[in-house]
Amino acid sequence: MRTIQFREAICEAMSEEMRSDDSIYLMGEEVAEYNGAYKASKGMLDEFGPERVIDTPISELGFAGIAIGSTMTGNRPIVEYMTFNFSLVGTDQIINNAAKIRQMSGGQFKCPIVFRGPTASAGQLAATHSQAFENWFANTPGLKVIVPSNPYDAKGLLKSAIRDDDPVIFMESEQMYGDKGEVPDGEYTIPIGVADIKREGDDVTIVSFGKIIKEAFLAADKLAEDGISCEIIDLRTVRPMDHQIIFESVKKTNRLVILEEAWPFGNVATEITYQVQSRAFDYLDAPIEKINTADTPAPYSPVLLKEWLPNSEDVVKAVKKVLYK
């Protein structure tokens, strides 16, 4: 099987869907002439032209509204944010229009739109460019939220997101665009709302998603040296969440650690903790451990940033804590 970069998987997913459906178009800052800020739309302007690959002014509120309005006339837009930190400017359109059009119109209108771009930290980008918003959007009924961790999942899930008749938040990472992975040549999709067991184990369940899951794999390798077997679940979709796969894993391992790159208050890990303790409490042999960023804005200093972010050492400590070792 061929190996391609994450950015190439994103580009392939968009291009393949645009070839099969003329109602799909891409818009955002620098997506056309510059081939995308992270080259995720490389070559698409040449293939599809300026009417379907559209450079926008620096006005996230404006082009989000244009795209959402166009869904009501039969279009299926893909909106790229240079970073989801900038999506805050367009949040009124996403939360108050995209997420609510179907219900408020009594089902007369649907809103098939994908908002995609990088989320969370990416090195020394400081406080306003290092925030994770998946839990914010997942809190909103009407939105689906996807956070893939590798090229294969990214392509399959993005194709499903583009075909979905409801608004989808599709979150990537600047630090993943160069990641390589095996992706088949043929057509495939991955259903939204289905998590994946990336590594099977018997002693503890680790749940994570997005780029931070790499720290879980590093920790699992380290723990294996001590004879500790970790099962790693990649959520892939934050909303709708695949609770059942987590419950079944906890029934087997009896211990749960959740790793997430977000502030500790009211996040995805908190929701998982509630669901497991409500529906699988009798299978737990230890309190659930959750690992998040520090409860402060992201620092610029590389020394402080290293301490702010969760890492594999944090995961090792959490696993040993739930194992009472």
Can you name each region flagged by the protein language model?
Residues 1-167, 171, 306-307, ...:
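Thiamine diphosphate
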